[in-house]
Structures are given as C-alpha cells and as structure tokens.
C-alpha cells in the first residue's frame, strides 16, 4: 500500500497543502489522479493490487464513469482480461451512450478516488437500468470514513487513506494562516501546492 502512495507522490498525484474540496470542505491533502494517468507504467503498477483482488471475483464488465474512471477501467480490464466500458454525461445525465450491458452481466465500477461513493450511484443506476448487476466499486484511492461508508461496497482499492477534512470555520490550516487555500480544478493547483509546502 505504501508503494502506491509513493507512486502517486512520484507523479504529483498526491498533493499536500491547503485545499478546497468540491464539497466545500478543506483538506491538507488532495489526490489529483489525472497526473497518474500521464504515466502508463505507474498507472499499471498502482492498479496491480486492485487487479489481483478483482481476479478472485466473477466479473464480466468493468465500468468507468467518465472522465476519472475511464483509464482505470481500461487498465483493470487489461490486467484481468475483462471487458471495459464507460458511462458518460449527456445533457448532465449519466448514461451508457457508446456501449451495451447485457442483461445479467456482472459489473464492477472503476473509480479514481472514492470519498463518499455518492457519484458512483449514478453509474450503478445506469448498469441496473441496462439489466446488469452492480457488484461494487474498485478504486485507486479509498478516502471513505467508517462513520460515512460508501452506499455501494468497495471491493478493492490500491490505497486506503484516512485524510481529515474540515468545515471552513473549523479548519486548523486556516486558523494557522500560513498556507493559502488552493481551489481545486484550477490550472495553477499543482504549482500553488508546491509553493505552499
């Protein structure tokens, strides 16, 4: 597991600093998984423990929600010999536009990072509407908390991280006043994060 964290750090996919999460909460760390996807060999190495667990399961299809899950679904399929497909948004609704799931096919959702598991519910709905069976989620990084587990079981992850996050008014980093708050998704995020260390 520490090997996976080192892989993420080696390609700047694991950032430390002061971050504004999409939930509005603050965190001292952030996983920018697109940076891992730049390096196929590192991505393959990070996904190896997930693929090993996946081989033990009776799975037909690995489904990656666009955008974050596409590469991971493909890599898991490559390592396990399964079929990979992806869901995508059309008019802001998650759907299966380019592929088909056959009734009764056993599906696994492949995600980059799972924090609450809520976003995977859309993909689960798509799988079930197509007649497939959603067995659970696999991910590179599992950030779920015991007090707030994912609504869909996480069957395998490459790395389990217990990263605290805070309401803005309770954030100890803000109270310290030393690190600027980095807004996620900005083009300067990686550079700002490095400057704050």
Residue positions per predicted region:
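PRPP-associated nucleotide enzymes
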Residues: 1-197
């Amino acid at each position: 597991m520490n090997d996976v964290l080192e892989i993420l750090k080696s390609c700047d996919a694991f950032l430390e600093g002061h971050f504004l999460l999409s939930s509005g909460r603050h965190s001292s760390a952030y996983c920018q998984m697109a940076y891992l996807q730049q390096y196929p060999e590192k991505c393959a190495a990070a996904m190896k423990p997930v693929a090993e667990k996946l081989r033990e399961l009776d799975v037909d299809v690995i489904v990656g929600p666009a955008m974050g899950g596409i590469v991971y679904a493909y890599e898991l399929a490559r390592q396990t010999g399964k079929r990979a497909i992806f869901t995508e948004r059309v008019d802001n609704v998650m759907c299966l536009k380019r592929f088909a799931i056959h009734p009764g096919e056993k599906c696994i959702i492949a995600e980059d990072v799972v924090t609450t598991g809520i976003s995977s519910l859309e993909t689960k709905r798509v799988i079930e509407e197509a007649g497939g069976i959603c067995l659970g989620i696999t991910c590179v990084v599992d950030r779920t908390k015991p007090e707030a587990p994912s609504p869909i079981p996480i069957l395998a992850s490459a790395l389990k991280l217990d990263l605290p996050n805070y309401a803005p008014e309770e954030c100890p980093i803000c109270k310290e006043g030393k690190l600027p708050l980095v807004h996620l998704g900005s083009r300067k995020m990686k550079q700002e994060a490095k400057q704050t260390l």
